Regions:
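Active-site groove signature of glycoside hydrolases
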Residues: 83-86, 146-175, 225-239
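Primarily a LysM-type cell-wall glycan-binding module
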Residues: 1-21, 42-44
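Glycan-recognition patch characteristic of GH18 chitinases/ENGases
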Residues: 49-148
């Protein structure tokens, strides 16, 4: 696998001849909508060869139940574990089921381990600080939730449990760590591992609802795998910037490896793009699109794709039909490879993709070129 950057005047036909492949293969692997059109700065994955020495690594991924069957089937061969998103619970501790039977069945057919993913998402669809507090401080509710988890794992044959609790009260930090410990003690005798997903902290003292309740050292002690959610620096309601900048990821990893065993860490990988209208105004929302759609947009608008070397992330500007300026930050083969190299550099267990609902053949080609995905089944 090679990665090349399109230069002015390049055509897919010329690139195919140069690298001894076909236009059809390049168009398919890179999800190129119109093979006759490229744009400068666009990165392409070229079939053949390997990026360095391929090591074994774990590849976890989240998916919503509405993922297209064909998109799921393309991803599963490259996955170690799949986390359908997500099971919830109410204030009495009753689990609210997720219609993920199709995903669990497909995962097992591909030797991919399906995980029951439990969150503190409330009725309104967002993470609920209050619901999380109830679970962490009410023993009766906690008992009911854990027993419900065990029943559902047995009923649907999940491989293990993934905990993704966000926006908890800072004063619930100790209680959340204790819950992770208790969940592991309940599930380990059943042969079920427990993983957690935690915010990208750069120090133990980092404050804020997103960070304070996540105790890196405790999760590293009690959980079998710890997913670092190293994305969303650029987010829907924030100012335009790279979604998953490598320079910020390094700060997180520099801290994380001092308190979490490296063999337990999965590095978060984003699989989406944001399109901001300029000038950006506080409270305005970016539009979410797939990485492939971002490239198509650049091509259709004749925009040159640039690459921020500090963040290791691609971006471009364009003007829409109404004359409004935009900036788009996304991920491409170069940015994905930069993050996979961090896994090797920091000797981590692997990666975790959020999410695989958007088709991204380039992502899988780059992962395939760097890793042999471990299979637990």
């Amino acid at each position: 696998m090679q990665i090349v950057e399109v230069k002015a005047g390049d055509t897919l036909y010329a690139l195919a001849r140069r690298y001894a492949t076909t236009v059809e293969a390049l168009a398919f692997d890179n999800q190129i909508a119109d093979p006759a059109r490229l744009t400068p700065g666009q990165s392409l994955v070229i079939p053949g060869g390997r990026e360095g020495v391929r090591r074994c690594a774990e590849v976890n991924a989240y998916a919503y139940p509405n993922i297209a069957p064909e998109v799921l089937q393309e991803a599963l061969p490259f996955l170690t574990a799949l986390c359908p998103f997500s099971w919830r619970f109410d204030a009495q501790g009753t689990l609210i089921p997720l219609a993920d039977e199709r995903l669990v069945e497909a995962a097992y057919a591909a030797d991919t381990a399906p995980m029951l993913t439990l969150t503190n998402i409330g009725e309104n669809g967002g993470f609920s600080t209050e619901l999380g507090h109830v679970l962490l401080t009410d023993g009766t509710v906690q008992d009911a939730v854990l027993e419900g988890v065990v029943e559902r794992i047995r009923e649907r044959d999940y491989y293990g449990l993934n905990l993704n609790f966000e926006y908890l009260q800072p004063f619930d930090r100790v209680a959340y760590s204790a819950f992770v410990k208790r969940a592991a003690e309940r599930l380990h005798p059943l042969g079920c591992p427990v993983s957690t997903a935690i915010a990208p902290k750069e120090s133990a003292e980092q404050e804020g609802f997103l960070y304070a309740a996540h105790d890196y050292a405790a999760h590293g002690t009690y959980a079998d795998r710890v997913i670092l959610m190293t994305y969303e620096w650029g987010y829907t309601f924030g100012a335009p910037q790279a979604i998953s900048p490598v320079n910020r990821i390094r700060r997180v990893l520099d801290y994380a490896v001092t308190v979490i065993p490296r063999r337990k860490i999965l590095l978060g990988i984003s699989n989406y793009a944001y399109d901001w209208t300029l000038p950006w105004k506080q409270g305005s929302a970016a539009r979410v699109l797939s990485d492939a759609a971002a490239v198509e947009l650049a091509v259709s608008r004749g925009a040159e794709i640039r690459f921020d070397e500090t963040a290791a992330a691609p971006w471009f500007n364009y003007v829409d039909a109404e004359g409004r300026a935009h900036v788009v930050w996304f991920e491409d083969a170069r940015s994905v490879l930069a993050r996979l190299r961090l896994v090797e550099e920091y000797r981590l267990a692997g990666i975790s993709v959020w999410t695989i609902n958007q088709r991204n053949r380039t992502l899988w080609k780059v992962i395939e070129g760097a890793f042999n995905a471990e299979k637990l089944l």
